[in-house]
A protein has these predicted regions:
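Glycine-rich phosphate/pyrophosphate-binding loop at beta-loop-alpha junctions
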Residues: 1-75, 120-139
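Active-site-adjacent helical/loop segments in soluble small-molecule enzymes
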Residues: 65-128
């Protein structure tokens, strides 16, 4: 689960994950207000979304993917999910309780786990799944 703004970190994760055919599945995590990777994946082409709505995840509030990142996203991203500021705030609290000091962008991946509960799971997670949460912002 990779926090995604313009897509450069996501591109790096996808490039690594796709070295072998049995690499991990990769999920882009974005603010619901600026989910350009998810929208682009669904459209099959780069889509710019308005990023003029305030969000606590300022570092992910981009609205447009880099052209170079799009190629890796198009060819390798399994799914994307948008998270709200409220979900991210709860994730920050949970991470803090577990001894991890994170800001909103860093907690977005943890928020995605909770957001996926009760929804159709694009990643097909099970009891034996290993999940890697990438945190891009500590405090």
């Amino acid at each position: 689960m990779v926090p995604t703004g313009v897509g450069s970190l996501l591109q790096a994760a996808l490039t690594h994950a796709r070295v072998s055919d049995d690499g991990p599945r990769v999920l882009a995590v974005e603010p619901v207000t600026a989910a350009c990777a998810t929208a682009s994946l669904a459209a099959g082409e780069p889509v710019a979304v308005p990023a003029d709505v305030a969000t606590s995840m300022a570092g992910l509030n981009c609205g447009t993917l880099s052209d170079l990142a799009w190629l890796a996203i198009r060819d390798g991203l399994d799914a994307g999910i948008g998270v709200t500021d409220e979900e991210t705030a709860r994730a920050i609290e949970q991470l803090e309780a577990d001894g991890v000091r994170s800001g909103p962008c860093g907690a977005a991946s943890a928020a995605a786990i909770t957001a996926m509960l009760g929804c159709p799971d694009p990643m097909e997670l099970g009891a034996d799944s290993r999940i890697v949460l990438v945190s891009t912002e500590g405090r």
